[in-house]
Amino acid sequence: MNGGRDGVRYRVLAVGLLLFCPVTLWGADNFRTAEYERNGAALDSINAAEAYSLGFSGKGVGVAVIDATGELNGDEFAGRVDSGAGWISSPWNGAFHGYAVAGVIGAAKNDSGIHGIAYQATLLPLGTTFSSDTLVNAQLNVLDRPDIKIVNNSWGYRIFNDTVQTFSADRQVELLDGIINNNMVIGTEMAKQGQLTVFAAGNEGHLTPSIIAGLPTLLDAYGIDNTLANNWLNVVAYDPSQRPSSAAFIASFSNLGFGSSAYTLLAPGVNIVSTRDANTTDTFSGTSFATPYVSGVAALTSEAFPYLNGKQLADILLSTATPLTGSNTPRAVLLIHKNYDDHQNYLSSDLNVYATGNAVTFSDEEMTVLLARVREDAFFDNLTDEQVRSAIRARASAQNINVLTTEDYQSLFGQGMVNAYKAVQGPGALNAQRLSNSDLNSGTFNGNYAIYGVDTQGYSSTWSNDIAQVKNTTSSSPLYQLDVGLRKQGAGALYLTGNNTYLGPTIVEGGSVVVGKVAQGSGSLAGDVWVQSAATLGGHGNIAGTVTLENGSTLSPGASVGTLTVGNVVFQPGSLYHYEIDEQGNADGLNVTRDATVAGTVVLDAPSQSLGDRFTLLNVGGTLSGSFDGLTSNSTQPFLQDTLSYGNKQAYLDVVRNNRAFNDVATSLNQRAVAQTIESQNSGPVFSAIANSRSEAAARSAFDNLDGEIYAASRAALLQRSRYVRDGINSALHDENAQSLWLSTWANKGQFDETAESSRVNHSGYGFLIGNGSPVGESSTLGVVVGAEKSKIKTDARAASNDVTAYHVGSYWGTGYRGIAWRSGLVYSYLDMGSERDIQVPGLTSRAQADYHAHLFQGFAEGSHRFAFNDSLSVEPYGNLSYAWLDLAGGQEHGSAAALRWERQDSGAGYSTLGLRGEARWSSLSPVRLYADAGYQRRLTPDRNQTRLSFVQGGDAYTVHSATDDRDALLVRAGVTLAIKQNATLLLGYQGLMSDKMSENSANMQFGLTF
């Protein structure tokens, strides 16, 4: 037999002379590396780079290689040789043939040498001497490995289907009982367990494949039951450097597909660079090296669709091949035909030209290629180049050319060139010629159909090719001329995104079928769809026929949210319509171009809805009959419910208010108050926002955010903070600065702790007072004071704050009477306030702001008596009474639909304090004095932490409460007074106020100057 382009010839004799066939998510361009380009023409001709760009490399797929090596060493195969690999025979010197075949399938993509078509596949090499015994044992070995789906066979015999019947009867019996029977029995068992057998057509320049590559045809010819044909592929070689229309495109050494067209594929087999051993590469030609391209594409396809068996892999490869038709048809084929006797002994070679016309004239380019091919055959060694050219021209002349009918000529090329890119996208047709009688659907689903079944076994995958139908044309078959349908079985989702023209029904028996994966994308079915119990139909596409949803089945438009268009729809009782609304309010839809009959249950999947929403469940172009039996929902929204309604040609889902009161979910006083107020509005944006709450917790959070607690908190904090002005005046009177010009400043920070009813209140600020007094009589002082203060009050949990600017003016009086020192003051403050509330409720998100003012009046009186132990130490018990009255002007917020308003309100707070001051100095002459103060403060008036509010949009007024101070608190002070000069003093001090529910800390400084 003619060997590779390197001129190597092989001949092996065994129990019959055996012949092998050696004529020796990036874009696609990202895969065209230097490693790829060493076989760039071959790989590009089968669209390999495009298949790689879809993410496929053969990873995880096992391919058996029955050939001349049982070991694959070197970096090209490291880590991807199956543990079952080994020699069936003793190792021999033909091993490089097996290395080369394995390299075409799965040499690594490692930036070195070459890479195979399925460069991450796992390989199972089984080494033979190509004797019948070793081949049978290798096949039996594969039969014990049902996990290996693809079996590559780059070997064969020099016997052909169209000549075997010319052999003697004894020779025919010998073949039938020997190699034919062995391969039939083993091949049948492989087919039963889902393995795909891929065979080289052979290199004898024959119109038909060798006897084993064409075994299904031979079995049919002898009338032998043939159950292996659908798991069998015959591979013909072509020259990838030539255009398909060229007379030099088909390899001149290759056997073709005549009589075996239904299971024949073409693959590149001329000048293929592959591994020769563990370290080197070489160039090879032959159907031996075309066959692994088909096996490799099968591995890519198996990776894409792990649930497919060998027959189904063959279905895809055959239906997605690029046919040699039209402008792609080779205008002629030159074959170097080798002649053998019935024992495979070589006799001679001759040239044959095949075409559909009466004569062919070859171009110079074609003649150059054809001349080189003929010169490789030793039979023509004695001819000159010109004699070879003349022989080629003579065979192409009108007198000698072999003229075939168009149908017979097309059959030479089988189904066309294997196409990796199309194959990894699913079938291109459902072929009833490749179905069995058991695939007949009789009467069910409204007719008789040939049904193609696939079990996705829990995998989800996409068939994106346009799937046509091929009818059975065998008149004796029960499938004769029936439309072809698809039966989807098993768990997992099957996405159909092509424009599918098969006319039989699509039967969804298990898992889901999604017609159209994305909105505005492709995806259509020409026939009916039947969805059976526990199965689902979805998608964004178009179904021209009738969709019937049986009891227990589900319709779920979209792939998530989307709209499905159908011709007719029938919801049978017990069926489910899964209707989804997403976070943005986009909803499923069903467009029915003709008639709809509805029943069953609508199952709503809606994480959020809005009051008053109306969603269209289906639009009907024809007649709408029936009604849905019920509605279930996963919604947790506490104040809404869904109802069904109908128009003449529509079914609707309406979102309405249920009868649950808003305050049913409230857990605090403030929540209940604001909930009742919002309920009283009956409509409007605030009412709708609460009605649209996703959960009870969300509603409570909304009540908290809307309640305006900052206004109650501000009143409580302002009354509490008023003491800093009183304390500044009192300190000046106590330290005898009141008869001079004095300055008092302070900075402070405090909080009211949160309670079960209200949030934590933080307040802080700083201010100053300037006073001036003069003596009145012998022991009295009268003075005036002015000042200003900045404060910030926050309720962080309510996302609210209030900025306060205060302007103070007042007077003070101090005197001594019968050993008691009396101090008192009166102050008026004008408060300029600006509030902000961040409204964080969905549907109301905004910032509510208000500018408003208030008036604060306060006064105090204190009496104390000083006990001096000596010139250095004294104590002073004291009692203090104070009162502050806050007059809040009316106002309202702006900037939000949830804005609040209020009328004029006032409140007051009175305090009493009993305490003891202590003072110490080193001596009577010391300029430094230390002081400390501890007191018990009691609030004499009730809590003053309420404010009456209402929404600008309307509704009843309500009272909101805030956290406030405790009735009883501990007051502490400490500091130092420095006599700077005879006429100047400086006081630095700390003051704290503490109780269970509040705390305050402040630092103060006072400076006095006497003139």
Predicted features, each with a name:
Residues 52, 57-59, 96, 108, ...:
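Substrate-binding/access-modulating region of protease and related hydrolase catalytic domains
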Residues 882, 894, 898-1011:
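Outer membrane beta-barrel transmembrane domains
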Residues 307, 319-468, 474, 587, ...:
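Outer-membrane translocation/initiation segment of Type V secreted surface proteins
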Residues 485-486, 496, 503-585, 591-601, ...:
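Extracellular beta-solenoid/beta-roll
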Residues 62, 67-70, 219-303:
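Extracellular S/T/G-rich loop segment that most often corresponds to the catalytic His/Ser-adjacent loop
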Residues 277-280, 287, 293, 300, ...:
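Extracellular repeat-rich scaffold modules on cell surfaces
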Residues 30-31, 36-39, 49-135, 146-149, ...:
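Subtilisin-like serine protease catalytic core
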Residues 682-867, 871, 987-1011:
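Outer membrane beta-barrel translocator domains of Type V secretion systems
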